[in-house]
């Protein structure tokens, strides 16, 4: 049994219709027992129906408010918009104490509308938020699933609400082996054991060589996912690799001399691969952007002509998808110069020329109609 006897609970998160992962929490019942017990019981649903006629249970509720570089907020299981919720003690209960501070990311704290108005709504910090000290009660922390929190934090929002529902599909209390293993980081389906964001990395201190090693592994995880037909996951791994590389854009003075060209080459490959997979997902704007990034570092990466040709081709595919056929044709001409015998480039060039011809014919027909 783990030394800590603090309660541990979990949320299984669903984004849209996609099962996303689990967030595990440890609750500080030794500091704020009443507040911790409220959250624990709302995870299990053991208190039954509330005074508002809704189950006292987080299951099925959503994260209704997300502000990047601040926090993600949920717990309104009555109105689902931040105006509702109910504690196990009644609608509201007093602030227990402000002993714990908002001094780091991944803390659990009570949302409120002023002093003594705690209900069921909570938030998870994603950065230190000292301006909330003395106003909101900290009562727990995330011990696993930080990548899930970051995924929610980085979702598109409108008026601070995620544009796709982020739902607590299941929740409860962890016991036995589940309790003991709750804080252990486990690899995902690709074998990736790393946190999604370098700021959350634990273990070996990050340095340029370490980040290069991690990014190289992530490239391989992405390749595996792509080969297995999971294009979205492959793209996630390539982008994650770039996040780790970006922690140290350049090697430091005492790093190996051959590290810099290796880092630049890996950056080129990750951008190029990202463009390929974005295009396959129909994300043509991203496909164009990432191909452009690859070309921006191609010289520094000493990229081979064949690899440059691939990137020009991938940018052309993205531009064609964006109906930017003239730009696509220019990139295909560059690609053809670098790889004159490439059949895919020739086929795409013919297709784009046909599209341009059809567009010009349509424009002429429209002009004739306008002036007739």
From Swiss-Prot:
The PPIase cyclophilin-type domain, residue ranges: 10-173
Entry function: PPIases accelerate the folding of proteins. It catalyzes the cis-trans isomerization of proline imidic peptide bonds in oligopeptides.
Catalytic activity of the protein: [protein]-peptidylproline (omega=180) = [protein]-peptidylproline (omega=0)
Name by which UniProt lists this protein: Peptidyl-prolyl cis-trans isomerase D
Compartmental location: Cytoplasm
InterPro entries to which the protein is assigned, alphabetical: Cyclophilin-like_dom_sf, Cyclophilin-type_PPIase_CS, Cyclophilin-type_PPIase_dom, TPR-like_helical_dom_sf, TPR_rpt
A GO term, aspect molecular function: unfolded protein binding
Superkingdom assignment: Eukaryota
Enzyme kind, highest EC tier: isomerase
TPR repeat ranges, renumbered to this chain: 215-248, 268-304, 309-342
Cellular component GO terms, alphabetical: cytoplasm; intracellular membrane-bounded organelle
Stated family: Belongs to the cyclophilin-type PPIase family. PPIase D subfamily.
The protein's Enzyme Commission number: 5.2.1.8
Lineage: Eukaryota, Fungi, Dikarya, Ascomycota, Pezizomycotina
Keywords from the named record: Cytoplasm, Isomerase, Repeat, Rotamase, TPR repeat
Biological processes per GO annotation: protein folding; protein refolding
Chain spans, region Disordered: 174-193
């Amino acid at each position: 049994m783990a030394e800590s006897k603090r309660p541990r609970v979990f949320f299984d998160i669903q984004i849209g219709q996609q099962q996303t992962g689990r967030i595990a929490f440890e609750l500080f019942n030794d500091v704020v027992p009443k507040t911790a017990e409220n959250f624990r019981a709302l995870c299990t649903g053991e208190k039954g129906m509330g005074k508002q006629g809704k189950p006292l249970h987080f299951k099925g509720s959503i994260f209704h408010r997300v502000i990047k570089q601040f926090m993600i907020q949920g717990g309104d299981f009555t109105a689902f918009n931040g105006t509702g919720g109910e504690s196990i003690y009644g609608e509201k209960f007093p602030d227990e104490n402000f002993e714990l501070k908002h001094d780091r990311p991944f803390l659990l704290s009570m949302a409120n509308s002023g002093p003594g108005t705690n209900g069921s709504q909570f938030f998870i910090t994603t950065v230190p938020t000292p301006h909330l000290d003395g106003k909101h009660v900290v009562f727990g922390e995330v011990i696993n699933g930080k990548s899930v929190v970051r995924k929610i934090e980085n979702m598109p929002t409108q008026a601070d609400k995620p544009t796709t529902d982020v739902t607590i599909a299941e929740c409860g209390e962890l016991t036995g082996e589940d309790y003991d293993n709750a804080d252990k980081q486990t690899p995902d389906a690709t074998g990736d054991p790393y946190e999604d964001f370098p700021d959350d990395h634990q273990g070996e201190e990050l340095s340029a060589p370490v980040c290069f090693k991690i990014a190289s592994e992530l490239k391989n995880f992405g390749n595996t996912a792509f080969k297995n037909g999971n294009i979205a996951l492959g793209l996630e791994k390539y982008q994650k690799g770039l996040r780790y590389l970006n922690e140290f854009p350049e090697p430091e003075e005492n790093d190996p001399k051959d590290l810099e060209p290796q880092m630049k080459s890996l950056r080129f490959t990750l951008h190029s691969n990202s463009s390929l997979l974005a295009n396959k997902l129909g994300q043509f704007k991203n496909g164009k952007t990432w191909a452009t990034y690859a070309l921006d570092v191609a010289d520094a990466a000493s990229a081979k002509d064949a690899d440059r040709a691939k990137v020009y081709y991938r940018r052309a595919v993205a531009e064609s998808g964006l109906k930017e056929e003239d730009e696509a044709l220019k990139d295909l001409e560059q690609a053809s110069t670098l790889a004159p015998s490439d059949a895919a480039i020739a086929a795409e060039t013919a297709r784009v020329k046909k599209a341009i011809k059809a567009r010009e014919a349509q424009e002429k027909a429209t002009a004739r109609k306008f002036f007739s």
